[in-house]
A protein has these predicted regions:
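Short, solvent-exposed recognition patches
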Residues: 1-90
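Surface-exposed amphipathic alpha-helical segments
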Residues: 90-121
Length: 121
């Protein structure tokens, strides 16, 4: 069974919209009333490139999420979302958050990720 993860902290006004399960990856979409979106995705393994295309990014910064190193991709245009990508070795999972939000906010969202084993079918 695939482990489920969820965001426990969201910026004000954001709420969960939908979940999309693909063969080995999961995409969760959160949005606010003005149409801004946070996309949280994760998959088993360490191939983060399949979650995230780092094409139109001007700058990559190393940041910390707790004790895990992550890459923050600063979008080159205001209209493009920023991205945060990291791999958890112990979970053998990689994670990605993309949102048109400031770096500090996206990191705070990432720090609130919780494993959710209470999956009710």
């Amino acid at each position: 069974t695939i482990v489920e993860y969820e965001l426990t902290w969201l910026p004000e006004g954001f709420s969960f919209q939908k979940e999309q399960d693909l063969s080995n990856s999961t995409y969760l979409t959160y949005a606010n009333d003005s149409g801004q979106r946070i996309l949280f995705s994760y998959l088993e393994g360490n191939d983060a490139t399949s979650l995230f295309m780092a094409a139109d990014y001007t700058e990559v910064q190393s940041v910390q999420i707790g004790n895990i190193n992550a890459d923050f991709y600063q979008a080159s245009q205001e209209t493009s979302p920023n991205g945060l990508v990291w791999v958890s070795e112990e979970e053998n999972m990689c994670f990605c958050i993309t949102a048109s939000l400031p770096k500090d906010t996206i990191i705070k969202v990432a720090e609130g990720i919780q494993k959710n084993n209470q999956k009710n079918f």
